[in-house]
Amino acid sequence: GTSGLISFPRT
């Protein structure tokens, strides 16, 4: 998980 405009799941 990243924080910002778009969040991506941590894989």
UniProtKB/Swiss-Prot annotation:
Primary location: secreted
Keywords: Amidation, Neuropeptide, Secreted
UniProt key word Secreted: yes
GO CC terms in record: extracellular region
Location relative to the cell: Secreted
Biological process annotations from GO: neuropeptide signaling pathway
InterPro entries given in the database record: Periviscerokinin (IPR013231)
Record has Secreted as a keyword: yes
Chain positions found as Threonine amide: T11
Sequence similarity: Belongs to the periviscerokinin family.
Task of the protein: Mediates visceral muscle contractile activity (myotropic activity).
Name listed for the protein in its UniProt record: Periviscerokinin-1
